[in-house]
Amino acid sequence: VTSALEPALDSFNCRRTLDVDGQAYDYFSLKEAEANGLIGIGNLPFSLKVLLENLLRHEDGRTVTSDDIRAVALWLQERKSDREIAFRPARVLMQDFTGVPAVVDLAAMRDAMAALGGDPQKINPLAPVDLVIDHSVMVDAFGSDKAFQVNVDKEYERNGERYAFLRWGAGAFDNFRVVPPGTGICHQVNLEYLAQAVWTREANGGDALAFPDSLVGTDSHTTMVNGLSVLGWGVGGIEAEAAMLGQPISMLIPEVVGFRLTGELRDGVTATDLVLTVTEMLRRMGVVGKFVEFYGTGLDNLPLEDRATIANMAPEYGATCGFFPIDEETIAYLKATGRKKSRIALVEAYARAQGLYRESDTPDPVFTATLALDLGSVEPSIAGPKRPQDRVPLARAAEAFAEALDKEYGKGAEADLRVPVKDKNFDLGHGDVVIAAITSCTNTSNPYVMVAAGLLAKN
């Protein structure tokens, strides 16, 4: 029986070898596939090229056929498709809230295997799984340099049994790692440590196999890692378990909306202001079930941390993902976050060989639809009062708050009401800022907005 992780066919004769600093890697060449019948695929959006490579690598004649592969090339004709394909992500990302049931299921499968007289040690994830413990923290202490340690200690006290179980799972199962509490939000850990941009594994009877990093995760903001050119999005627990066991994710070949960025952000304008503007534009267009891919000369002026902020909010603008291609900034970020030199060399060499590397003069891909934004036009903004996708220009903050107080909450008559605070020498009224907290996974990997939030909290 052919493994779900090892291809049986190569209908387009595109399996080649790439040498990087003396290390040989097998890979499925998109350029060779184009030369061997997949005409025009060099014009595909970068995100669809990643999907296409995934199909070429997993062609088995059953879950992935040559017609499925041709359908991606034919997407260029109508710039959309009703073809359903089987996508196998390279890995799975979980957090402790949804990940514990998955580990319980694996343990139950081992019990069942033992009851049937088989070897329970054969039950393991086929795709690599990283479970980041981040959803159990509670803020008991704050406003102190000791707050972090106090909160971590209480977290261990409250969740000792769960954490002991996960620690057992990390030791018992192959292909399963647990990132301990207090390390960071799972999407931050994924972006800064786990993601590789190009993944490798040992191939059966050959050199190591190189392919684009991709994943599904059990949290909607898994999309953050698309800022690092890693295709991924959030799925339900059952789908994640299926992917963990080597089963494909069924999906339609998506429409891809191209979002052209030009210019650069003005001083004092942050990635938060930008992402609120992008979200407003994309929600107006309607991108549910679609990929969004960012392109244009503005990418040359957009740090990877800002790209990750934009990619993170894909659930808020409704897209499956917001993808950024590999370029010079991607390589610089991998270096800055301490990835291995050999991996960084592979990422650049592989991306260039596959036509997955963006440069300033790279021709624009073909998209289903496009829209554009001059980064210089973005203005300072806030969100709310209820939903993160509701952008309010900072200049309109007072006016927007007064409107919301009256229309949303029916308290317009109390706008000027002040209430003395017992045992304090101040009073409070509607509109006063009483809590300043840095909590969102959207911001935790962006030092610029972290500093801005800290200054706001301080003042």
Task: For the regions a language model picked out, list residue spans one by one.
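Fe-S-dependent hydro-lyases/dehydratases of central metabolism
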Residues: 1-459
